Amino acid sequence: MGSGKAFLFSPSLLWSQTRGVRLIFLLLTLHLGNCVDKADDEDDEDLTMNKTWVLAPKIHEGDITQILNSLLQGYDNKLRPDIGVRPTVIETDVYVNSIGPVDPINMEYTIDIIFAQTWFDSRLKFNSTMKVLMLNSNMVGKIWIPDTFFRNSRKSDAHWITTPNRLLRIWSDGRVLYTLRLTINAECYLQLHNFPMDEHSCPLEFSSYGYPKNEIEYKWKKPSVEVADPKYWRLYQFAFVGLRNSTEISHTISGDYIIMTIFFDLSRRMGYFTIQTYIPCILTVVLSWVSFWINKDAVPARTSLGITTVLTMTTLSTIARKSLPKVSYVTAMDLFVSVCFIFVFAALMEYGTLHYFTSNNKGKTTRGRKLKNKTSASPGLHAGSTLIPMNSISLPQGEDDYGYQCLEGKDCTSFFCCFDDCRTGSWREGRIHIRIAKIDSYSRIFFPTAFALFNLVYWVGYLYL
C-alpha cells in the first residue's frame, strides 16, 4: 500500500458527534414550536379584532345626523301616527317625587312628578347598528307629541333649570319615549265633616285634550305607580296612606275621552289640633267647674271666673275656624267646641240662677216674717201659724219654715217645687223637689259626668264608627 497516515476509528468520537447533532435538533424543534405558538396567538388576536370590528362598527356624528335628517324628511308632526288606520296607543307611567303641601283653605295640593309617555310611530323607524337614539329636548318640537293635559290642574310648571327637564328617545322599531318633570297644583275637594279626623283621596286626572278614544287610547304601562320615599314629603298635617290608579271614560259632546286617574289617599294627623284646640277646650271646661266649689256669696270671684271661661272658649272657637275653609256644614271640631262652649256657659248660668234665687230667698224671708207678725193676732188661727198666698192657694206654715212663695208660673208649679216651704201639702205630691241651696252639689256631679259621657260618645263615634 502507499504511504500515508492510517485512519483510526474511535467509538468515543462517534458518540460525541451524535450527541451534538441531537442537541442541535432539539433546540431547533423548540424554537420552531415557539414560533408556531406565537403565530397562532397573533392569528387569534387578529381574528378577534376582526370580529369586534364587524359587530360594533364605529358610529360617527355624521351618521346620526344623516339618520335624523332621513327621519324628518317629509315628516308631518301635525298628524298622529297611523291616522285613519288605527288608534294610537299611549302607554303612560308616573313617578311621584313628592306630594305636598296640602292647602285645605283653597282645597288643592302640590305634586312633583316625572310623567312618561310611550307610543309607536312607524314613520320614525330606521336601519342602523344603533338601536336607540338618545335625544335632548330640541327634538321634541319636530315630531308628533300627544296632547295630554291634566284635567284638575289649577297651575302646572315645567322645570327648566339648568336645561329643560325633558327626555326623548327613539328606537329603531319606531318606539318613542317622552318624559318630562312637572310640578302641579291640583284640585282636591275635601269633605270636612269629620275634621280633624278626616281622610281624603286626592285625584290627579289626565287625558287627551282633543283626541277621543277612537283616536288615542291611554293605557297604564305598569299596574301601579312608583313613588319616592314619603318621609321626605312636605305633608305636614297629613300622612300618606297609599295610592291607586284607575281608567274611566268621560262622555262629552265632542266625543268619549279616556281619563287616567291616580288617587292619593291621605289621612290627617291630629297632633296639631289636639294641642291647639282639644286640650285647651277640655281644660277650659274643667276650669269652669271650679266655681261649684267656691262659696255662693263670693259673687265677684264666681262671676269673673265664668265670664273668663266663656271668653276663652269664644277665642278658641275662632282660632279653630281659621284653619278651615268657610264650609256651610258642621265639622267634628265645630261640634266639640260648641258643646264645650255650652258647658262653660251653663256653668255661668248655674251660678246666675243660684244667686238670683238665694237673693230672693233672703228678701222674701224678711217679708214673710213681717206678714206673720201682722196676722198673729187675727181670730181663727192658732198661735204660731200664718197664711202665705202661694199661687192663689193659702197654706199654713210653721214658724220655722220659710215665708216665701214658690216659683211663679204654670210650668214651674206643675213640675217643680223649688223651696223648702213647698215640700208640705198633698197637692205637692209627685213633683220634683229641688233645693236651690244644693244646686252646687248637684252640679259637681252632673257636669263632670255629662262631659265624660259626651267625650266617650264623641271619640268612639268619630274614631271607630
Swiss-Prot record:
Pfam family, any one = Neur_chan_memb
State where the protein is found: Postsynaptic cell membrane; Cell membrane
**So which stretches are on the Extracellular side?**
21-273, 321-328
What terms describe the molecular function in GO for this protein? chloride channel activity; extracellular ligand-gated monoatomic ion channel activity; GABA receptor binding; GABA-A receptor activity
Q: How would you describe the post-translational modification of this protein?
A: May be palmitoylated.
Q: Which residues cross the membrane?
A: 274-294, 301-320, 329-349, 445-465
Cytoplasmic-side segments: 295-300, 350-444
* Alphabetical UniProt keywords: Cell membrane, Chloride, Chloride channel, Disulfide bond, Glycoprotein, Ion channel, Ion transport, Lipoprotein, Membrane, Palmitate, Postsynaptic cell membrane, Signal, Synapse, Transmembrane, Transmembrane helix, Transport
Q: Which GO terms describe its cellular component?
A: chloride channel complex; postsynaptic membrane; receptor complex
Cystine pairings recorded for this chain: C188-C202
Mode of membrane association:
Multi-pass membrane protein
Q: Which family does it belong to?
A: Belongs to the ligand-gated ion channel (TC 1.A.9) family. Gamma-aminobutyric acid receptor (TC 1.A.9.5) subfamily. GABRG1 sub-subfamily.
> Domain comment text?
GABAARs subunits share a common topological structure: a peptide sequence made up of a long extracellular N-terminal, four transmembrane domains, intracellular or cytoplasmic domain located between the third and the fourth transmembrane domains.
Output this protein's name.
Gamma-aminobutyric acid receptor subunit gamma-1
